[in-house]
Swiss-Prot record:
Region (Disordered): 1-29, 522-597
Main location: endoplasmic reticulum
Glycosylation sites: N251, N272, N449
Family: Belongs to the unc-93 family.
Gene Ontology terms: cellular component: early phagosome; endoplasmic reticulum; endoplasmic reticulum membrane; endosome; Golgi membrane; lysosome
Subunit (UniProt): Interacts with TLR3, TLR5, TLR7, and TLR9 (probably via transmembrane domain).
Protein name, UniProt field: Protein unc-93 homolog B1
TM annotation in the entry: 64-84, 110-130, 132-152, 160-180, 223-243, 285-305, 343-363, 378-398, 403-423, 428-448, 469-489, 491-511
Native source organism of the sequence: Homo sapiens (Human)
Membrane topology: Multi-pass membrane protein
Keyword set, alphabetical order: Adaptive immunity, Antiviral defense, Cytoplasmic vesicle, Endoplasmic reticulum, Endosome, Glycoprotein, Immunity, Innate immunity, Lysosome, Membrane, Phosphoprotein, Transmembrane, Transmembrane helix
CDD domains: MFS_unc93B1 (cd17408)
Amino acid sequence: MEAEPPLYPMAGAAGPQGDEDLLGVPDGPEAPLDELVGAYPNYNEEEEERRYYRRKRLGVLKNVLAASAGGMLTYGVYLGLLQMQLILHYDETYREVKYGNMGLPDIDSKMLMGINVTPIAALLYTPVLIRFFGTKWMMFLAVGIYALFVSTNYWERYYTLVPSAVALGMAIVPLWASMGNYITRMAQKYHEYSHYKEQDGQGMKQRPPRGSHAPYLLVFQAIFYSFFHLSFACAQLPMIYFLNHYLYDLNHTLYNVQSCGTNSHGILSGFNKTVLRTLPRSGNLIVVESVLMAVAFLAMLLVLGLCGAAYRPTEEIDLRSVGWGNIFQLPFKHVRDYRLRHLVPFFIYSGFEVLFACTGIALGYGVCSVGLERLAYLLVAYSLGASAASLLGLLGLWLPRPVPLVAGAGVHLLLTFILFFWAPVPRVLQHSWILYVAAALWGVGSALNKTGLSTLLGILYEDKERQDFIFTIYHWWQAVAIFTVYLGSSLHMKAKLAVLLVTLVAAAVSYLRMEQKLRRGVAPRQPRIPRPQHKVRGYRYLEEDNSDESDAEGEHGDGAEEEAPPAGPRPGPEPAGLGRRPCPYEQAQGGDGPEEQ
């Protein structure tokens, strides 16, 4: 009886099965290795590389959109809740019925003090926190603190509102510094992924030309601020769809108001102490706060799940390894740079103008004359104007660099002159369209200011080792300006406008002076960034050269670098240096190397 052949031929077996399989490929020791482990026959390396970098670029766009949407939702929830909370707590009937003698006005004043005063200390800890947690995780942590502030409004007490307000004040500057750093890094990454062929030709250590990422930075900052300025409109949704139904009309709330605009003093002098016709039910308030809490949680998920890392893990290690003492000192050392000193007046004005939009135009000119029920629509006009005008920052792709920033300053200068001589009549609605136009135009100037400043800093300081320090300084000066506005809230409107006008003129002149120095080729004095001092031995540091070292490190190093070895192959295994262990290949070639103690 003849034996049946095996179902699967044995590899290398001789016999009647033959030396070839059904596909004609030789079996056994004669089988070609390329047929088994060779490249895919239809593999196109150039096409696969193009697809890979295309996915990388789409990932960068996803990061920018997620960070922008997260910032918009976070500030929309925060501003909307704070506005609704202050209006409810202002009404004395609401305070007496809901909270009795708990001292709600005192709690509100302490809460505002915590939000406005705490950021003054942010220069001391912001760079340390960003380097410790990393840019993305600092954003996530700060957004989480904003969500914590929202959650404390479920139980409004001194021991919930005031500590959460202090924590929120501590998170303001780190959030904005990390976001500015994040958007700038995304622009640099997008440029890297778009010009990968040029980088392959130049080598990984060759730095791209200075300012080459500027077009992408202009686009990304325009996208970010276009989203962010929509947060002012999102913040008015609780007011429009909920709180406006409970408000008195302007004839009641403005009954004792005698002067508005440039003739007003403080904030809403003579405004009625009762603004609510009926008190909102506690269940309705809980529903509104729950919706806001859900949106804040969504913002956290956006940052956590959709925002990728700003740096590679090895770069994060290098950024931390310069020493915590150096990280603490470097923001102060950057004051030596004349570019930053010339931009400080613009940083201060940037804080002044956004607070003036919310308190001066919206309250001193708007609510004072057309009533509290139109506050939301004034801020929506400001928001839409600013969001649309953020896209005007793209004009920097074709116009000289100073044009958008100076144009925004010019719009604000014109409006400030007009507001200085305008005093709207209380309880008269005929001039309400002027208020909406003024709010929208102020938003245009704000957008050009914010977009222009952030783009300018990203262009002037493109070294990854400096960006968190620079954006920390920028937003710290903004926080100082906001604190100054908080202290001077009781001043006469003419005094506020005069301070605004002087600061704006000084900022524009100082900025143009800086641009003139740059055109003359005056070299800025930048502090040296110390080289990373790694305390661990890991696979990342087996090689002597630092693959993540930037040109700034190489050019401005501390002079302790070793001479480069002569080019050309060296016979035998490379001897292990004093600072590293021999790799396994070297150990196999030349022994186990020096023994460790």
